[in-house]
Amino acid sequence: MTTLKITPAKLNGSVCVPSSKSMGHREIICAGLSAGTSIVDNISMSDDMEATLRCLTALGIGFQKVPSERSGRTALAINGSGNVRVSQSTVDCGESGSTLRFMIPLGALCGEPLTFTGHGKLVTRPLQAYYDIFDRQGLSYTTASNGYLPLTVNGVLKSGDYELPGNVSSQFISGLLFALPLLAGDSVLKITSALESQSYVD
């Protein structure tokens, strides 16, 4: 039998902690919506992050991997143009709910048909919060049966008043926060009940 002796001691040094996937999605999207090139470092790459990058590419936003200051991490140079346009008619969101819900409002800025697809359980993830907004605005969209993917959005969101319940996923709120500032007029996003995922929105 091997005996392991542990001697108490004070720790010192530095540790590079894994980055937040939720924040990583948001950071690269914000960089893509900004004018000019932004460097986003310490990204923990995953299938979900790759899905978000695919969607950015479909919206005319370029990127390339660049050397990271942190060993084992990924850094991206995001080439934002300050707006979005459809450069691919179909985007595959993989199994990433964050990607899908963040990108739908951005796709609804383009004024051209854009189809969102996915795999696994993502196909049946609820999107009714967006469908209600589209219905109120008369924005054209089509889905498979029961509101499932694929979803094709064809129209442009209008500036104005928006409402979402506070118990809806913060992904819906973040998606609108990405898109509404890019509209020509002012908009108000009202949360109609207590916000349950405030840390992600803040």
Report each predicted region and the residues it spans.
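Structural preference for solvent-exposed beta-strand-turn elements
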Residues: 1-202
